[in-house]
Amino acid sequence: MAQRFQLNSQTLPTADPLKRVSLIPRSAEQRLADNAGERRPLAPRSHEDNPFGGHTDDHHVAAPADHNKVMDHNSENLGSIVPKTAHYPHPSEEILDANIRHSMVPKSLGPNSLGGRFGPGKKQAFHRNGRPMFSLSDDRVMADRVLKTHSPDMIFFDVTSLLSVVNDIFKSHVPSIDSSAPKPSLVFKDYADHTSFETFADLIDQISCEIDCKCLHGGESHGMMTSGLHLDSRNTTTFSVLSLVSKYRWDAKLVLVLSALAVKYGVFLLLAETHATNQLTKSLALIKQLPSIFSRQNALHQRLDKTRILMQDMVDLTTTIIDIYQLPPNHITAAFTDHIPTAVYWIVRCVLICVSHISGASGFKQDQIMSFMEVSEIHENSERLRKINAYLLEQFKKSKMTIEEGIIEEEYQELIQTFTTIIHVDVVPPLLRLLRPIDFLYHGAGVSKRRVGINVLTQKHVLLLISDLENIEKELYILESLYTEAWQQSFEILWVPVQDFWTEADDAKFEALHMNMRWYVLGEPRKLRRAAIRFVREWWGFKNRPILVALDPKGQVMSTNAFPMVWIWQPFAHPFTTARERDLWSEQEWNLEFLIDGTDPHSLNQLVDGKYICLYGGEDMQWIKNFTSLWRNVAKAANIQLEMVYVGKRNPKNGIQPIINTIREENLSHTLPDLFQIWFFWTRVESMWESKQRMLKAHGIKGREGFKEEEKDLVLQEVVAMLGYGGEGDGWGLVSKASDMMVRAKGNLFSRGLAEFNEWEVNIPTKGFLTALNDHLLMRLPPHHCTRFMLPETAGIIPNEVECTECRRTMEKYYLYQCCLE
């Protein structure tokens, strides 16, 4: 019959909170303290009723739990043991059948707790397998006690290297006695650089002796005792070990204690590996009672495999703590320091558990596998360590992110200073700051490509071609055609690929792209710093479209995107300054020669010969056939020499390739050579619009003033009209001769005007062909029209108002998001 223990807290000496381990729930202990009455333990009737009757130390000990009985948590007689049929579960526990309490699955930890399977608000200890679990308040008290053992005196050593050696030992396995089993490949590491570990050999031996002497004498060798004495002994040993390493930093403490465990585990494995072939180790194994153990491979492997799980969790948590102490001191906050003592305590305690299992290997019976209690003990502690590690890792990642963001911000501000306020005498220093840690470039095409230093750009004008790897083919194609010897004498081009993330596929694409480039290419662009990427995105406006940043020989930024000037005027735009851009526009007239410059050499030659040139576009093949037929008839009737050129539309896709093929096959007219040239034609028109807007912005003209300024700018009006034509799929046409006026109209209107040639041909002798045609088209303008104008993607230059090219009224503004896949 089970006896009821009555407790008198006044007669017992005060015990340390961690030393005072009870099977009584903490909530019940609180009620006991508040009870005015007094309880005294009843004398046991016999030794069988109370096997600990003779024990009189100062520990608060409850009777060992009978597996057929469960704790009565609601009973007024606290601490009593009652039959399982009278079990009343505590509200915080799940209601489980008493017969399966020993197979209870571990509960998950709460989000704010680190000490065990208890979350916020769970004040009582859980009891599993007769083994009490500390509550959260216990952990706080325990952490305070751990802190009292901590008095570091700035002793530092290479904890990472020593932990690496320890981890190598932990990963070793007991060799199989089966000769047919495959042997693991041997990889020998060089530990020649680890001579500094000799300093700690004596301390590691001392820790090992402390664990062996106290742990084993306390009955822990087999890891089978579950009484309060067993746990209290392990707790005492934990603090004894912590006292030995009191003068070391937290991470160093752990590595030294784990080293002691590694020595014990390693010696055990050496005996297991060589006892059958080496007389000395065979004798040692005999003294240690190991030969029979080594013959029971299944049980031995099961025991050590379970132990290695806990070892790995200890190494993982220790690695995290080492990483934490690599942070700058001001970033090791309370989020770490409040929990690291707890982590240290449990790792040292888990070392004792592992020692128990390793030392206890010689004590288990023939073919006996690990008991449920032993497996559960490892599982519980692994769960605890992983919980702590997950929390510390999360805090560590947050701290690393904060540090990295601070570094990026500092480097970003430094780059702003470099390219705005600092005066340089050469272009190389600012380039080195922007591109570091990359310090070399590629130069030359194909097999002649070689590595050179950045200093080859000394005292040169440099164009930084900044792009990603996905949207640069067209720019590269056109730049290659423009990169003549005259260009190379004026400035150098340096390609800087910019991507937030790099993959192996990106590396391969980069290699393929830069192999055929004749200009300079940044080496290893994947190493470009995040601050540099942020700078070119935010300060220089790089988004999706490539940009061309112009630097003078002293590193001063001439233009954050010289592409519009390059597309419009090519090398004549040098040195790409705002002043140069203004001068070029002041000298430029709107004519067909300017419109097609650099895009269609054939048409330029025809202009030189005095022929009329008609540019047209659209996607309606029937209209194209009718339009070209009308023009042939008019040209023949008017006795003029006419060349027609199909220029497609803006953002050409593969969908217009069949149209180009039909035009060529049926010999309807000329076309631009390929899709790249069509893209370049319309990109030049977009660049004209962007350049004009940039001029207005540079002069501080905006709002209504900008609108009025645009009204005066005939070139800008014509550019807007062209962009309106190119953005639609409908047909349109434009005709001119050399430097004469240009006549333009939408497709149906133009076709109607050509069909009515008989009505206006009489005016040709007096007005001229182009003026007569233009006047007739103006008379045929429909009273109602719908004109659309899609702005090109530019660096944030969006005018508030745009004038309609047909009626000169202000156009309504809409937002268009478009995705066209072909």
UniProtKB/Swiss-Prot annotation:
MF terms (GO), sorted A to Z: protein homodimerization activity
Disrupted gene: phenotype observed: No visible phenotype under normal growth conditions.
Pfam name, any one: SEO_C
Tissues and organs where the protein is expressed, per its UniProt entry: Expressed in phloem sieve elements.
Highest taxon, organism lineage: Eukaryota
Biased composition (Basic and acidic residues): 28-62
PANTHER family: PROTEIN SIEVE ELEMENT OCCLUSION A (PTHR33232:SF16), PROTEIN SIEVE ELEMENT OCCLUSION B-LIKE (PTHR33232)
Protein name: Protein SIEVE ELEMENT OCCLUSION A
